[in-house]
UniProtKB/Swiss-Prot annotation:
This is Protein-export protein SecB. It holds the Pfam family SecB. The keyword Cytoplasm applies. GO terms for biological process: protein folding; protein tetramerization; protein transport. InterPro entries: SecB, SecB-like_sf. The gene is secB. It comes from Rhodopseudomonas palustris (strain BisA53).
Length: 161
């Protein structure tokens, strides 16, 4: 193909995703019943994990993405431990079509952050006197779809019929 003057058209520049920074915004670990909570438990504790993703534009083509992970381990009668982590990154994203930008920021960016957040949580739990908590991989596509469905339902409820 040529562009009319005999020269081939220039290819569009490829999409780019650069990690400019990664950091812990907030970390909390609580072991409220220590040292009693460190004793062997009669049964496996129930562990509940909540994961959310937030993002905001910082400048043109730059976004801060925050991965929020909260968890609790509960025994038969009391809280064993709890933690909260907000782990964030600053990303530069260029040459991405506008319709693909939101999914990229909310799916791929947290996917890049997750292994680091997982390590921080495992270390905090271990340092709290427990075996390291190894979080299972997260389906960020499913989380994105779930959040988009929830937002659509909320918007539909908010709009008058």
């Amino acid at each position: 193909m040529t562009n009319g003057n005999g020269t081939p058209p220039e290819a569009a520049p490829p999409p780019q995703l650069n990690v400019l920074a990664q950091y812990t915004k907030d970390l909390s670990f609580e072991n409220p019943n220590a040292p009693a909570s460190l004793a062997p438990q009669p049964q496996q504790p129930a562990i509940n994990i909540q994961i959310n993703v937030g993002a905001k534009a910082l400048a043109e083509n730059e976004y801060e993405v925050t991965l929020s992970i909260e968890g609790k381990a509960e025994g038969a009668s009391s809280l064993i431990f709890s933690f909260e982590l907000q782990y964030a990154g600053v990303f530069r994203i260029v040459n991405v079509p506008q319709e693909n930008l939101h999914p990229l920021v909310m799916i791929e960016c947290p996917r890049l952050l997750f292994p680091f957040a997982r390590e921080i949580i495992a270390t905090a739990v271990r340092d709290g006197g427990f075996p390291p908590l190894m979080l299972d991989p997260v389906d960020f596509v499913g989380l994105y779809r779930q959040n988009m469905d929830r937002q659509a339902a909320e918007a539909q409820q908010a709009s008058p019929n």
